[in-house]
């Protein structure tokens, strides 16, 4: 049980990196990017291609791929996403769904259907682990991924809180019209958000390829996991995204103790439970009653009946 909790905690770091970009893009541009998981796979295959064809270390390849992913995000926002911002919710969904299909088939044409991994390029690190008291085995790569997740989210928090660009992003996310009246350049903000979001997707894809295998059509599964982590943790909070990723990872690890197929099922059940609770609270709020029938609710009903 303890080992499963630790493994779930570390898995949450990967989910946090994966979900942060999805949450940022939705928070700033109100776009649910259905190609987010496929962009993560693009980043993974980019790192794999550099390591296989040029003999680069995975870490150096990752450092080269991340700026390219950021440029891809800027290009997508400028030539694709920007044209759908004022078209309602359906068109962005259709456009990003189509983008995901294009990316999947492009990767299939370039790399085939065979699953790939960065394990061999990492050498001993791919299998290295620490033994904790009680005989608990913890892999070094999951720990590194979790540390990277905390560092990345901390850096993003500093960016959003202490820089002019960050304040512009937060203003555009909270009230786009008021931000525009205050002189915030929406196009600049959207491009920055898209660059960060797609780079984070690429980072998550590379982290996955270091610990497991990736294949061209694996994007939709990653999208579901990212979406669940965002909903569980709450949209608009970076540390909430980390919490959502950790809760999702712990649920999956505990589910795997019950049965192998329980890994994904437990995560889905947690997502549905949290989503149902949020919808119930929203419904109670819309009715003008407290979400929980505590003493304030009882007192309010007594006053109303009097």
Regions picked out by a protein language model, each given a short descriptive name:
Residues 1-17, 46, 56-61, 87-93, ...:
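Membrane-interfacial amphipathic/re-entrant helices at transmembrane-helix boundaries
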Residues 110, 174-188, 258-306:
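Cytosolic-side transmembrane-helix boundaries in multi-pass membrane proteins
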Residues 70-71, 75, 96-114, 134, ...:
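Mid-bilayer segments of alpha-helical transmembrane spans in multi-pass integral membrane proteins
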Residues 2-52, 76-91, 230-238:
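Single transmembrane alpha-helix segments in multi-pass membrane proteins
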């Amino acid at each position: 049980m303890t080992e499963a909790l630790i493994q779930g905690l570390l898995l949450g770091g990967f989910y946090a990196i994966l979900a942060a970009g999805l949450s940022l893009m939705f928070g700033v541009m109100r776009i649910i990017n259905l190609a987010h998981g496929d962009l993560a796979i693009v980043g993974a295959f980019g790192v794999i291609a550099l390591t296989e064809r040029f003999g680069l270390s995975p870490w150096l390849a990752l450092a080269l791929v991340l700026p390219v992913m950021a440029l891809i995000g800027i290009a997508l926002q400028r030539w694709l996403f920007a044209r759908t911002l004022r078209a309602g919710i359906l068109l962005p969904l259709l456009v990003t769904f189509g983008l995901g299909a294009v990316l999947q088939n492009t990767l299939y044409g370039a790399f085939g259907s065979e699953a790939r991994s960065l394990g061999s390029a990492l050498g001993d690190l791919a299998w290295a682990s620490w033994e904790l008291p009680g005989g608990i085995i913890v892999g070094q790569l999951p720990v590194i991924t979790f540390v990277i997740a905390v560092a990345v989210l901390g850096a993003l928090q500093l960016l959003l809180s202490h820089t002019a660009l960050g304040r512009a992003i937060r203003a555009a996310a909270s009230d786009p019209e008021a931000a525009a009246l205050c002189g915030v350049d929406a196009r600049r903000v959207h491009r920055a958000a898209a660059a960060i979001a797609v780079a984070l997707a690429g980072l998550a894809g590379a982290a996955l390829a270091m610990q497991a295998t990736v294949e061209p059509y694996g994007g939709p599964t990653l999208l579901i996991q990212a979406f669940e982590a965002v909903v569980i943790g709450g949209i608009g909070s970076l540390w909430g995204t980390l919490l959502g990723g950790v809760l999702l990872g712990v649920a999956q690890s505990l589910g795997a103790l019950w049965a192998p197929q329980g890994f994904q099922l437990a995560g889905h059940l947690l997502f549905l439970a949290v989503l149902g609770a949020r919808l119930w609270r929203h419904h109670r709020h819309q009715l003008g009653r407290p979400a929980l029938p505590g003493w304030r609710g009882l007192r309010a009903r007594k006053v109303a009946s009097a």
